């Protein structure tokens, strides 16, 4: 039996929830990609683009001991895009190289607005938190870049010699 890559939580950030809509399959797509990569997904939460809800969801994952939290959405430049700001408040240590890798892999895939994403990546306790833009293309490309980097970081955090 293969050892799981880690436990994960997905947090979909969308104002569509306020209007009674869902996250348009973003959480399901992230779940599918993480499971394919060997992660055990503990759950998928959907919250509106509000600091309190986002912070609560992130803290739920950190306190619950998941290895990886992937937020989807709310990474742009509008006043309602607060996911990176809240994430920056929750993390203990930033991983700006991974955030830049996400932006540049999007650019390489032809998503020219990828560099406008304000998404951050960092560690809170022993949990990696990563912000990914909400489009299906951004999710697919972002997870392809994020998963091996997150695995490496999770391995470092769980190694008693390195950690």
Residue ranges and their predicted role:
Residues 1-163:
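Non-catalytic beta/alpha edge segments that cap or flank active sites
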